[in-house]
């Protein structure tokens, strides 16, 4: 059982622990011959010119990552060659980038496929666990790149390209947003609605009838939407709503002990405000006078 284990970018080779033992000649001819021992039993052979190869930060980072997986003690020896610590970030959609003490840098792969492929540089944000690093474009000053670490700084990220194009097409969006901003002074002149449950009051005929939840102007008892009075059939806006309160504590939602009430069996809806006429053909006000 022998096979080769290739290290990416051609950094060194691996040999089995028994190399160059005599066990190769003892194998039978009919057995399938595999080149090399299992991966977890392989050991790394570092080339003699490793110091020259490590001068390239991209190659050094790859070698250090491979050597750490094979032998953790070997990474300490590699650090003595060059004192700059390098961390590699790999993304499937954007190029590899390295963040070191000198600043963020974009490193292109040395493979032939990446050299031949010509694509436009795309602006992207690489999100890490602790920082957001912006990939610099070609010809951009490295000193102008900043590392965003805090939530307040992360909120200052540039908008995507599609949103920039949209702002160019609609330049008035930002101005209109500022005009309709909800400031404390603007809220005073605007009306907000809230639900209330109480009695309707008609000012003309002085009639009152029970109502369900209606939309009232916030802070008042005025009904916002127009409704017709059952008696005078006048569309008066707004109606006034009197909240149904407890006679003892004068609260809408009270915790007083319930009292026995006289309930008319023929007209239970008058005593129980539970909406008996809901989803029915005729409402209760058609048959009964709720004055």
From Swiss-Prot:
Example GO molecular function: zinc ion binding
SS bond list? none
Principal localization reads cytoplasm
Tell me yes or no: is Magnesium among this UniProt entry's keywords.
no
Chain spans, region Disordered: 103-152
Q: Which superkingdom does the taxonomy of this entry point to? A: Eukaryota
Location(s) in or outside the cell: Cytoplasm, Cytoplasmic ribonucleoprotein granule
Tell me which GO cellular component terms the UniProt record holds.
cytoplasm; cytoplasmic ribonucleoprotein granule; intracellular membraneless organelle
Per UniProt, the ranges with Basic and acidic residues bias are 116-129
Pfam families, per the entry:
Zn_ribbon_3CxxC
- Any Gene Ontology biological process: negative regulation of translation
Q: What happens when the gene is disrupted?
A: No visible phenotype: mice are viable and females are fertile. Mice lacking Zar1 and Zar1l oocytes display delayed meiotic resumption and polar body-1 emission and a higher incidence of abnormal meiotic spindle formation and chromosome aneuploidy. The grown oocytes of Zar1 and Zar1l mutant mice contain decreased levels of many maternal mRNAs and display a reduced level of protein synthesis.
Q: Which UniProt keywords apply?
A: Cytoplasm, Developmental protein, Differentiation, Metal-binding, Oogenesis, RNA-binding, Zinc, Zinc-finger
Q: In which tissues is it expressed?
A: Expressed in oocytes and zygotes. Predominantly expressed in maturing oocytes before maternal-to-zygotic transition (MZT). Less abundant than Zar1.
Where are the 3CxxC-type Zn fingers located?
195-280
Spans of biased composition, class Low complexity?
Answer: 106-115
The written remark on domains in the entry is: Disordered region at the N-terminus undergoes liquid-liquid phase separation (LLPS) for the formation of membraneless compartments that store maternal mRNAs in oocytes. The 3CxxC-type mediates binding to the 3'-UTR of mRNAs.
Give the family from UniProt. Answer: Belongs to the ZAR1 family.
Family annotation (PANTHER family): PROTEIN ZAR1-LIKE, ZYGOTE ARREST PROTEIN 1-LIKE ISOFORM X1
Q: How does it assemble?
A: Interacts with YBX2.
Stated role:
mRNA-binding protein required for maternal mRNA storage, translation and degradation during oocyte maturation. Probably promotes formation of some phase-separated membraneless compartment that stores maternal mRNAs in oocytes: acts by undergoing liquid-liquid phase separation upon binding to maternal mRNAs. Binds to the 3'-UTR of maternal mRNAs, inhibiting their translation.
What is the name of the protein in this document? Protein ZAR1-like
Instruction: Identify the gene encoding this protein.
Output: Zar1l
């Amino acid at each position: 059982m022998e096979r080769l284990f290739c290290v990416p970018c051609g950094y060194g080779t691996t040999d089995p622990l028994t190399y160059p033992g005599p066990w190769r000649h003892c194998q039978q001819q009919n057995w399938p011959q595999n080149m090399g021992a299992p991966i977890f039993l392989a050991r790394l052979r570092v080339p003699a010119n490793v110091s020259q190869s490590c001068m390239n930060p991209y190659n050094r980072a790859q070698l250090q990552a491979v050597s750490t997986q094979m032998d953790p003690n070997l990474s300490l020896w590699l650090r003595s060659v060059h004192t700059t610590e390098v961390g590699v970030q790999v993304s499937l959609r954007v190029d590899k980038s390295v963040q070191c003490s000198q600043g963020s840098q974009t490193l292109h792969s040395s493979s032939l496929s990446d050299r031949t492929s010509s694509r436009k540089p795309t602006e992207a944000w690489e999100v890490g666990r602790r920082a957001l690093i912006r990939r610099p474009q070609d010809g951009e000053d490295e000193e102008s790149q900043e590392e965003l670490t805090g939530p307040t700084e992360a909120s200052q990220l540039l908008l995507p390209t599609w949103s920039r194009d949209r702002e160019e097409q609609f330049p008035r969006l930002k101005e209109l947003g500022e005009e309709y901003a909800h400031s404390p002074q603007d809220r005073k002149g605007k009306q907000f609605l809230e639900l209330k449950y109480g009695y309707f009051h008609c000012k003309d005929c002085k009639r009152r009838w029970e109502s369900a939840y209606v939309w009232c102007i916030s802070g008042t008892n005025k009904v916002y939407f127009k409704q017709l009075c059952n008696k005078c059939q006048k569309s008066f806006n707004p109606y006034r709503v009197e909240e149904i309160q407890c006679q003892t504590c004068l609260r809408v939602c009270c915790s007083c002990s319930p009292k026995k009430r006289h309930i008319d069996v023929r007209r239970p809806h008058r005593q129980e405000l539970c909406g008996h006429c809901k989803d029915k053909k005729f409402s209760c006000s058609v048959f009964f006078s709720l004055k």
